[in-house]
Every structure is written in C-alpha cells, then in structure tokens.
C-alpha cells in the first residue's frame, strides 16, 4: 500500500506479465517497490466463471443481444462469461489511423491479461534472434539464444510450464512439468502423423499439471479464458 512521504527505490507501472515480474525481481533483491495499477483487485471466487454452466448465465453465455457491439466490440475474446475481466470500450475509447484498424484487447485489473491469457510459453530460438540473416528483413537481435537460455530456465521453473522435450533446433526444450494429457482425437493424430512425415508434440503451456510452490494444478475444466479459480496457470 502506498505510504505518503515514503521514498521508493523504483516504481513499476502495471501488474501484467512485464510489470508483475519486474516487481517480483526487484523486491526480492531487497528494493522498496511501489506498484501502480489502474484497475482493481478481482476476487476469483466471485469474478471467475471457469466452472459456470450456460444455465448459470442470464443469456446462456451469449450475452444480451447487442451488448458486445455497444460495450466491448474490440474485446474479441470476451463473452458473457468473461467480460468482467476486460475493459469496456465505451468507457475507454481510442482511435487508429485511417485504414489501419486495430483491436486493442485490454484488462485494467491487478494481473492484467494474465488473468485470461492463452498460456503459450514457447522459447524463442536463434532463427528468431537472427531472422535478418535468413530473410534479409530488419536487423538481428543483439542477443542470442544461448544468452537467454538461463533466464528461460529461471522463468519456467517458477511459472510452471507443462510440455515435453522434443530435441528440435527451432523449438528449444526447457524445464517442464509433465505435459498435458492428450484427448482421444489428439491421440489419433499422434498415431497417424508419422505416416505422413510429421510428429505431434504438446504445447508449451504455462499450465501446472502438478502443484509447485504451493499453487494449484489443472483439473481440465477447459474454460481457462474465464479466469482460473484453481490457480493452475501463471498470473
């Protein structure tokens, strides 16, 4: 909590993926941090609907006719289940250059879009860092994968990323929790893929398949975009 007259070592603006991690690292080094967030703290028990069924929703999950167009037209991943995790476009308008529309998905809450993100946690590789060498466009990054690897290790160990090692240069392996179990359709694809020269691997998902650091694990309810009251993915 902000204390008038107190001197802070650093101010972090925003509590999403970047701001939240910056505050964690700086405070763990003994620094006094002030974190500024434009939104409120949500209550998972009240604001998350990952276990809600259509009959729990007033409009069976489809929302009141015309509500999306009037209130949150740019929040394309929002629904009657999850609109409380997003801003209302009508209250926070913005403009874009003519002929260059942009749909800006925003969440003004503690945690930001980490409350409902896609949890895709792939590592970049040297094809990314040296892209200009391959396609001649732009500039290469001033860093290489080998320099980033230890930091990927640190983040994955803390966050909890479920996947499997595949030993592919364009898809670097990391420190993983057990992979998410495949469903029936995925198992069929995994079986036939080698026959056409392909292979199937599980997504690198920041989803805990077992409990670490005293946090929850996934129980496969499937409605991750509506917030996770089990605390099974990083936010």
Q: Regions from the language model: what does each represent?
A:
Residues 1-7:
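A short, basic/flexible loop-to-alpha-helix module at the beginning of a structural domain
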Residues 10-35:
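N-terminal Rossmann-like FAD-binding beta1-loop-alpha1 element of flavoenzymes
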Residues 19, 42, 209:
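Flexible, glycine-rich phosphate/dinucleotide-binding loops
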Residues 27-49:
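Glycine-rich FAD pyrophosphate-binding loop
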Residues 48-64:
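Acidic, Ser/Thr-rich peripheral helices and adjacent loops at domain boundaries
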